[in-house]
């Protein structure tokens, strides 16, 4: 819910899995959240920006988390398309 100023005022905003778009429940202790840093192409230094990926426990249990993270990173341009 938003107030008149457009700020979110909900007490709890659930996370969603980046790969499957499932809601990650509070009791899903196998889920992970990963921040991937963006670096400057010239200097190779961290520029203060990052991409956040959340993977639910069901994807990790199936052994598909590495493929899902690679697919998401390719879509965001972090990893080259021909990797």
Swiss-Prot record:
GO BP annotations, alphabetical order:
cytoplasmic translation; endonucleolytic cleavage in ITS1 to separate SSU-rRNA from 5.8S rRNA and LSU-rRNA from tricistronic rRNA transcript (SSU-rRNA, 5.8S rRNA, LSU-rRNA); endonucleolytic cleavage to generate mature 3'-end of SSU-rRNA from (SSU-rRNA, 5.8S rRNA, LSU-rRNA); translation
Show the PROSITE patterns listed in the entry: RIBOSOMAL_S21E
Endoplasmic reticulum found in the keyword field: yes
Residues that the record marks as modified (N6-acetyllysine) are 81
Q: Which InterPro entries match?
A: Ribosomal_eS21, Ribosomal_eS21_CS, Ribosomal_eS21_sf
Q: Where is this cross-link: Glycyl lysine isopeptide (Lys-Gly) (interchain with G-Cter in SUMO2)?
A: 41
Give each disulfide bond as a residue pair.
none
The modified positions for N-acetylmethionine read 1
Q: Which UniProt keywords apply?
A: Acetylation, Cytoplasm, Endoplasmic reticulum, Isopeptide bond, Ribonucleoprotein, Ribosomal protein, Ubl conjugation
Q: What protein family does this chain belong to?
A: Belongs to the eukaryotic ribosomal protein eS21 family.
Q: How does it assemble?
A: Component of the 40S small ribosomal subunit.
Role, per record: Component of the small ribosomal subunit. The ribosome is a large ribonucleoprotein complex responsible for the synthesis of proteins in the cell.
Q: What is this protein called?
A: Small ribosomal subunit protein eS21
Species lineage, top-down? Eukaryota, Metazoa, Chordata, Craniata, Vertebrata
């Amino acid at each position: 819910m938003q107030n008149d100023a457009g700020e979110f005022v909900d007490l709890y905003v659930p996370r969603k899995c980046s790969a499957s778009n499932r809601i990650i429940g509070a009791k899903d202790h196998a889920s992970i959240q990963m921040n991937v840093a963006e670096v400057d192409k010239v200097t190779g230094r961290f520029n203060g920006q990052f991409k956040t990926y959340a993977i639910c426990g069901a994807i990790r249990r199936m052994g598909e988390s590495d493929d899902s993270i690679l697919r998401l990173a390719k879509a965001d341009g972090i990893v080259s398309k021909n990797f």
